[in-house]
Every structure is written in C-alpha cells, then in structure tokens.
C-alpha cells in the first residue's frame, strides 16, 4: 500500500508537470487532511515526487474530512500564492467546483485526485475507479456471506465523490448479481473510526441478522472492524 501511494503521488506531480510544461514550478497540494495513514503516505510521496521532478510543493489539509469550509479557505490561500498549478482532493464535489473555476480564470491549472469536483475544468483526475472498487467489494462480500442476507454500508463523507461512487458501485453490483442480498441504507461516519464503530453497533443492534458490512475508506473500515 505504501509503495502504491508513493507511485500515486509521483503520478500526480508528473501529470501536473506535463500539463503546464514548465520546470521549477510551485505546485501546492490541498488534500482531505492528515488523519489517515493514506494521506500521510501521499504526503511523503508528494514530497519525494517534487524533489525528483525539481519542483516546489506544499501539502495542507483540514483538521478532518468534514471541514469543507476550512478546505475552501486552504484552496483560496494556495491560489493567493499564484502557483503554476494546484492539486486538490475535494471534500465536496459541488462546494469546491467554483474554486476550480476561479483558479482556471487566474491561469492556475488544477489536477484533482482521489475525489474530484463537478466540473470539466481540471486538466486531469487521478484516482482509483471508485465505482469498480465498490462493485469488487460487493463481489467479495457476497462470496463471504453466501450471496444472501442483509449487508450494510458504512461510508465516509456524504458529498465526497469517492464515497458516493464506491457506495453506488457496491449497490449496483448487488442489485445486478445478488438478488437474495438486501443492502441496508448507507450510513455515514465522516471517515472517523469512532463514529464508524458507533454506526456499526447501531446497525447490528437494529439488524441482528445482518451478514456483512462494507466500509468505504480507511477510517470507516477500522470502525467497522472495532465494532465486530
């Protein structure tokens, strides 16, 4: 996982470098935060990639993945530096879209990663195929529960594209291939392990016959694991 995330970060900066066709660039990164190992590893990979490419970067993020207003402020601060480009993992696909438009109007190229925005402005989007990931999670969980029974979803942040797409991919695959599996309504944990654990406990108490639960990100999965 750590190696993959280093490669992921390198591809982000390489993508931006090829997009703006310059060297010695300033390419700030606004992530979703620092609270999960994933983001810590992406930070290290970003810094390593910038060094390798000869570019300057900074890495910031909000206190947690619910702080949309804080992330907006961080993006505004980054744009005020007049960078060559900006890399953004958006907490909310709609709320961050206007800032991407603003960046573009100022000549700042934007690459989104992990979770994008509802805009065609970004020059590239670097991420896993979240719907496919959700579908593959559905196949794996269906195999574990014998393709029948109730299953739940503990997703991370409502409004973020990765949570939406992973959940949609999971639900669509269950409907398509596993008619004997009932998917319970999605519950959101804000990516917080404690909240995810509490949501999981509530789900199990309300559905004592539940067969399995899908956690859509690191924090959600840790919470589910702690609960069961």
Regions found by a protein language model. Give the residues of each.
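Bacterial N-terminal signal peptides
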Residues: 8-18
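A residue-level marker of the well-folded mature domains of exported/periplasmic proteins
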Residues: 21-228
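Positively charged n-region of N-terminal signal peptides that target proteins for export
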Residues: 1-5
């Amino acid at each position: 996982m750590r190696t993959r995330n280093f490669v992921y970060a390198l591809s982000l900066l390489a993508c931006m470098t090829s997009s703006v066709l310059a060297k010695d660039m300033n390419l700030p990164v606004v992530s979703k935060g620092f609270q999960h190992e994933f983001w810590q590893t992406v930070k290290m990979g970003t810094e390593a990639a910038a060094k390798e490419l000869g570019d300057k970067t900074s890495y910031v993020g909000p206190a947690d993945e619910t702080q949309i207003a804080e992330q907006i402020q961080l993006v505004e601060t980054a744009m005020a530096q007049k960078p060559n480009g900006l890399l953004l993992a958006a907490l909310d696909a709609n709320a961050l879209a206007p800032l991407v438009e603003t960046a573009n109007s100022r000549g700042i190229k934007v690459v989104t990663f992990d979770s994008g925005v509802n805009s065609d402005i970004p020059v590239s989007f670097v991420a896993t195929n979240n719907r496919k990931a959700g579908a593959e999670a559905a196949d794996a969980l269906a195999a574990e529960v014998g393709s029948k029974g109730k299953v739940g979803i503990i997703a991370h942040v409502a409004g973020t594209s990765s949570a939406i797409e992973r959940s949609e991919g999971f639900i669509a695959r269950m409907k398509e291939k596993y008619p004997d599996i009932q998917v319970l309504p999605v519950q959101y944990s804000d990516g917080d392990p404690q909240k995810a654990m509490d949501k999981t406990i509530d789900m199990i108490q309300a559905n004592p016959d539940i067969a399995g639960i899908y956690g859509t990100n690191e924090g959600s999965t840790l919470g589910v694991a702690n609960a069961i």
